[in-house]
């Protein structure tokens, strides 16, 4: 007894479910067959449409050639006949009418453009008017344009004659201002009267080659300020005297001979007097021979430094009113520099005035007087770190601190160009008598911080993670032409870009546009070779992706095909692996691998298998960038579902196990090649390379590979996981291109870059965009505020 009943010899009676499952599978198989047939019909329909488009293109080419021939024959007939027959002239009338209509249409278009331009000009005019009204209603604009200072009277428009008349009517002696440098100093009326009563001797000191006249020239004033600064440098650091009253005031009445000028004899004589006494006390330690004793100078300097400044300084105004409301006459002074030192200072009245090594008329160097009897203490030196130190901190306890902003000082860097630097709110000790002391006195903290920041910026490497640039031409459907390539292109036979089993690639140039292209010359021997080239052209006609090379034109001859393609000059990716001057990091490999996966993903979306992916078939866009393009679609095949495709070609070390075993190929076949390329980029080694091709294929069939301990030391586990999930013998277990792009290793590039002390270019562009957006936002806010300011404000 076998244990099986006679009624059911096969033992299948109680098993009803398997039979039902078989019926379901049969139904599913039928549906799959129907779906396969539909897909095949769609593919055939697509091929038919492509062939018809090619026929249409060829017909258009033939029609264009016929039109050219017809035009040539018509031109020959016109040249042969001496005069145009009436019928030809009548036939040309409609063309003339069409040209006239076209001219009228263009005229109407130009009129519309002119009208739009006129509207734009009107809008700009309104905007300018709005800006002008806003600027006029602004107090800052009044301060800049008219020279008015809050709490003062007068402006730049006031003339010297009017101010002098106002001063005479008021009957009060005004405080005078040296207008050459915009410097103002307040002095008490007691000092002014004492100086008027005294008989000031005339002194002469050699060393200041200046002649002061009473004509107004702005350029000469700046030269005078620079020359007087040279006189200050002779005294040495820390020994510049304080400005006394005589330095900051001018004679009251104008000269009778020239009604618009004032003598400077008293002020310059006081300068020469003070500095001569200082020089004599330094040279021989003798007693100074000034018209007033040291105690008077100390008292006078103390009054000047501690006297209250009733009004803040305004811009460089040649005439400003005193606090009592009286007008101050403008003093036009012309300073002319002489080449020979030792000349005398002369006024227009002809009396020689002793020159002195003093601060320039356009510059007043200040200092504080501590308690004690020394009239001229040295200038305290400070660095830029204590730029906020006020004058009250440096003045002695016995003296009253100076109130109001300090006087304007002239920066030594601007003396050569004659500009004036207003340094309001800076203590007088900040003025360095020697020009070279400014930068030398800066604190080391800022310098060290600048060095550290510059070193940190230099250490950060910027990686360009942007997408590959598109082809310099629009995507086109190319039809193979049977004309000569030399008619439209110039092929450089001596400049070979690459080569392989198919032939060679030369650089070429389009004659009409000068566009640089690449010419791939493929040798054909039989009908099968021609079909393969046509298949390559058909596949490239369907590809339009930045990581895939683009086809531009195609030509056919008796023994070869020439494909005109996009040109890139970065070289093969294989060179990046083998060349010692290129040091690939893991982040570089991430950028390369991601673009390879994007190109393969596009191919697989269009049911195309590349089947020959390797570093030699991947070109870099530039010598140092990270943008790539996949080339060589000669072995590419269209993948058709339910159609068992087998291939027996390819480079041995990049072949998938199913290709070596001559099994069916599909999308995972390309992903195996992607895994091999990634392994090579990470380590520089080939995972399956043997001494012979047979040994290499044996390693591939057995999937015999591992991570080299030395080369993969220090690489992330994510990179190893990425390679391990691609180099799998079973096709269904490999990652697809979509899964590769979603893998952790190819994601989160900014975080990986920050961990590697690398900055991505996309991050820089984003930061720049955010900064520009923020700037625009602030600009709009300021614009809105300025528009609101056009409304009248309360007085």
Swiss-Prot record:
Q: Which GO terms describe its biological process?
A: cardiac myofibril assembly; cellular response to interleukin-1; positive regulation of membrane permeability; positive regulation of sarcomere organization; positive regulation of tight junction disassembly; sarcomere organization; sarcomerogenesis
GN (gene name): Mylk3
Q: Where is the protein localized? A: Cytoplasm
The family classification in the record reads: Belongs to the protein kinase superfamily. CAMK Ser/Thr protein kinase family.
GO cellular component assignments = cytoplasm; cytosol
**Single GO molecular-function term?**
myosin light chain kinase activity
Protein name as catalogued: Myosin light chain kinase 3
- Keyword check for Cell cycle, yes or no: no
| Disulphide-bridged cysteine pairs | none
């Amino acid at each position: 007894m076998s244990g099986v009943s006679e009624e059911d010899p096969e033992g299948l009676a109680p098993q009803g479910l398997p039979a039902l499952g078989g019926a379901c599978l049969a139904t599913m198989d039928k549906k799959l067959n129907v779906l396969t047939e539909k897909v095949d019909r769609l593919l055939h329909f697509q091929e038919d449409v492509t062939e018809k488009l090619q026929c249409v293109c060829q017909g258009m080419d033939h029609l264009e050639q016929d039109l050219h021939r017809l035009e040539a024959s018509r031109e020959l007939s016109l040249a042969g006949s001496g005069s145009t027959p009436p019928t030809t002239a009548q036939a040309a009338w409609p063309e003339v009418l069409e040209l006239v209509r076209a001219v009228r249409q263009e005229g109407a278009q130009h009129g519309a453009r002119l009208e739009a331009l006129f509207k734009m000009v009107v809008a700009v005019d309104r905007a300018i008017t709005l800006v002008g009204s806003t600027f006029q209603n602004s107090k800052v604009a009044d301060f800049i344009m008219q020279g008015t200072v809050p709490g003062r009277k007068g402006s730049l428009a006031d003339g010297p004659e009017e101010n002098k008349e106002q001063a005479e009517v008021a009957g009060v002696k005004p405080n005078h201002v040296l207008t050459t440098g915009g410097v103002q100093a307040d002095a008490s009326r007691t000092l002014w009267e004492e100086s008027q009563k005294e008989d000031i001797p005339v002194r002469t000191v050699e060393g200041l080659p200046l002649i002061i006249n009473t004509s107004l020239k702005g350029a000469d004033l700046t030269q005078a300020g620079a020359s007087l600064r040279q006189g200050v440098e002779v005294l040495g650091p820390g020994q510049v005297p304080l400005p006394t009253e005589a330095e900051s005031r001018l004679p009251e009445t104008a000269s009778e001979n020239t009604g618009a000028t004032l003598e400077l004899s008293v002020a310059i004589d006081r300068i020469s007097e003070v500095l001569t006494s200082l020089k004599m006390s330094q040279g021989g330690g003798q007693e100074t021979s000034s018209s007033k004793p040291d105690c008077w100078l100390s008292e006078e300097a103390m009054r000047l430094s501690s006297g209250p400044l009733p009004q803040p300084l305004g811009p460089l105004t040649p005439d400003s009113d005193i606090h009592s409301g009286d007008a101050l006459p403008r003093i036009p002074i012309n300073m002319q520099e002489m080449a020979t030192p030792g000349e005398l200072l002369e006024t227009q009245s002809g009396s020689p005035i002793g020159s002195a090594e003093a601060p320039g008329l356009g510059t007043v160097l200040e200092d504080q007087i501590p308690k004690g009897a020394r009239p001229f203490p040295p200038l305290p030196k400070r660095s830029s770190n204590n730029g906020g130190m006020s004058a009250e901190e440096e003045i002695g306890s016995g003296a009253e601190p100076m109130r109001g902003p300090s006087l304007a000082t002239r920066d030594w860097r601007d003396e050569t160009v004659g500009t004036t630097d207003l340094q309001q709110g800076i203590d007088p000790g900040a003025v360095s008598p020697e020009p070279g002391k400014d930068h030398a006195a800066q604190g080391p903290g800022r310098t060290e911080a600048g060095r550290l920041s510059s070193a940190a910026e230099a250490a950060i490497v910027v990686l360009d993670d942007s997408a590959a640039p598109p082809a310099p031409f629009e995507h086109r459907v190319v039809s193979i032409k049977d004309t000569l390539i030399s008619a439209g292109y110039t092929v450089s036979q001596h400049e070979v870009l690459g080569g392989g089993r198919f032939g060679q690639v030369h650089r070429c140039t389009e004659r009409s546009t000068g566009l640089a292209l690449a010419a791939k010359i493929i040798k054909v021997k039989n009908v099968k070779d021609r079909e393969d080239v046509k298949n390559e052209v058909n596949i490239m006609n369907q590809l339009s992706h930045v990581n895939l090379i683009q086809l531009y034109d195609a030509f056919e001859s008796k023994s070869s095909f020439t494909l005109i393609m996009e040109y890139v000059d970065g070289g093969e990716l294989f060179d990046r692996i083998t060349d010692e001057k290129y040091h690939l990091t893991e982040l570089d490999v991430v950028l390369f691998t991601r673009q390879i996966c994007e190109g393969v993903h596009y191919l697989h979306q269009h049911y195309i298998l590349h089947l020959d992916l390797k570093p030699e078939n991947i070109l870099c866009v530039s010598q140092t960038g990270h943008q790539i393009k996949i080339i060589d679609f000669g072995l590419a095949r269209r993948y058709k579902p339910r159609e068992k495709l087998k291939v027996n070609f390819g480079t041995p070390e990049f072949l998938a196990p199913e290709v070596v075993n001559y099994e069916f190929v599909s999308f995972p076949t390309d992903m195996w090649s992607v895994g091999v390329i990634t392994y090579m980029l990470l380590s520089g080694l080939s995972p399956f390379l043997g001494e012979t091709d047979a040994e290499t294929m044996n390693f591939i069939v057995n999937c015999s590979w591992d991570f080299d301990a030395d080369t993969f030391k220090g690489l992330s586990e994510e990179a190893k996981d990425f390679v391990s999930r691609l180099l799998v013998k079973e096709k269904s277990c490999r990652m697809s291109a979509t899964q590769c792009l979603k893998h952790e290793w190819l994601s989160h590039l900014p975080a990986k870059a920050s961990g590697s002390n690398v900055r991505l270019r996309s991050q820089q562009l984003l930061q720049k965009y955010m900064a520009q957006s923020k700037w625009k936002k602030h600009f709009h806010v300021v614009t809105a505020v300025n528009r609101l300011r056009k409304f009248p404000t309360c007085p």
